[in-house]
A protein has these predicted regions:
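A short acidic, leucine-rich amphipathic alpha-helix
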Residues: 48-51
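Short helix-capping/hinge SLiMs at alpha-helix to coil transitions
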Residues: 23-24, 38-41
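Short, cationic-aromatic polyanion-contact patches
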Residues: 24-29, 45, 78-99
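N-terminal leader segment of winged-helix/HTH proteins
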Residues: 1-24
């Protein structure tokens, strides 16, 4: 694959990632930065991210901070400098383990709320709680099997 073909393929990959992640609440910049880091062979500096994506360094900083905060990127310190490097995590289990725990907490909250509720509300809360627990358990199972 030529450099031009590789660049075009990476652009398509980043654009597709945007279309997939926007419904999940990711901004265009965050989704493109995530895809960029996933496609890179080596960690990137903020300057590289900003230059390669054609965005302001402040936007690259905001995007990487958000990705790091949710476990979708890793921040590395470059020895002997203040410069930071960013890379995609080697495992995606972190953000999904956090989501699994959140789903179980939501299910607990729904179960607590059922007390003293009417029949229809109790049934609705029970169904939602069961769904959330099943999703949390499914995530935990995948992490155990593949993580």
């Amino acid at each position: 694959m030529s450099n031009a073909d590789h660049a075009a393929s990476t652009e398509r990959f980043m654009d597709e990632m945007v279309s997939l992640m926007e419904p999940w609440g990711w901004s265009r910049t965050v989704a493109r930065t995530f895809a960029y880091l996933m496609a890179r062979e080596a960690p990137a500096t903020l300057d590289e991210i900003a230059d390669d994506l054609g965005i302001a360094k402040s936007n690259a900083s905001m995007a990487t901070r958000e990705l790091v905060d949710y476990g979708n990127a890793v921040r590395l310190r470059q020895p002997g400098t203040k410069q930071l490097l960013f890379e995609a995590p080697s495992s995606q289990t972190g953000p999904f383990a956090m989501r699994s725990a959140m789903l179980c907490k939501m299910a607990d909250l729904l179960d607590q709320q059922k007390q003293g509720m009417g029949e229809a509300a109790t049934a609705r809360l029970s169904r939602q709680s069961a769904f959330l627990r099943a999703m949390g358990e499914a995530i935990d199972s995948v992490i155990r099997d593949l993580g």
